[in-house]
Amino acid sequence: ALDKNAAVLCSDTIPARYAFTNAHLFKGEFEPETVIAVDVAGLQLFGEGNGVPRYSRHVDLCIDHHAGNSGYADFTLLDGTAAAAAELMYRVILEMGVDITPHIADCLYTGVATDTGCFRFSATTANTHLVAAKLIEAGCHVEELNTLLFDTKPRARMEAERIARNHLEYYLDGRCALIYLTRDEIEQTGVDPADLEELTSLPISIEGVKVGLTLRQQPGGSYRISVRTAKGVDACAIARRLGGGGHNRAAGCELLGNLENAKNAILAEVEAELDAPQEDA
């Protein structure tokens, strides 16, 4: 729209279901005039894949909604009250005077809907719904997108979910539920690693559970841990003590060592948080 070349780079492989969002963008290597990071709260979260470190050494602008953003970029557009980074992108596009085409609306709606769990997460605000409404007015294909994003699961993802459910464990008098997948199990199913993000909602959906944990072994052997919590329990505080971060109700960290060590480390922090005086989170 502004006659500029743009490319999207992500350390992880972008899932096939999101291919429509960047199909028209530049492909290949080039020397960017400006590097912009979106929805990345700290340098350690960029990852090492797909040549990302070449570009993340110097970031000109960061657009983010994580209150704990480390301020690594030259300039930062930060709103910790926004439920999704795509809400901020919507504002930026309007300020730039760009017309929101149906394709742009599809991309922004995808960001808003996925970051809010289809508008179910506690961070969702009236403004989130207003932005979604404006995107629908602009021509986004809301029915098709919701079906693609929330009602369609690859078979490999279903197999991974079956295995994870079989590993379901309860701790701390049922206040904490945990599921996990080893690297062998992930490779056995052939599941797209990005589809595993959807597993994080399983343990916290169980009645009576205050903290839901999902552990996924990474190619190097470490365990990526996703923390989801009920109202009044600070997920970010749990993850932060282990070098991670995130939001009040959704956070994560990564731990070296075997499965039992990872379990013990995260459960110790969960117990400490659950036994501490709680405020609404």
Question: At which residue positions do the language-model features occur?
Answer:
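Short alpha-helices
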Residues: 65-131
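N-terminal small/polar loop signature for handling phosphorylated ligands or for N-terminal nucleophile
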Residues: 1-56
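Short amphipathic alpha-helical segments
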Residues: 48-51, 74-75, 239
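Short, well-ordered beta-strand core segments
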Residues: 35, 60-62, 76-77, 212
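Short beta-strand "acidic-cap" motif of Rossmann-like dinucleotide-binding folds
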Residues: 8, 62-64
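Short glycine-rich anion-binding loops that position phosphate/pyrophosphate groups of nucleotides
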Residues: 40-43, 66-68, 183-184, 218
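Short glycine-/acidic-enriched loop or helix-start segments at secondary-structure transitions
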Residues: 45-49, 72, 224
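Hydrophobic helix-and-loop "lid/oligomerization" segment in the mid-to-C-terminal part
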Residues: 1-13, 17, 31-32, 114-242, ...
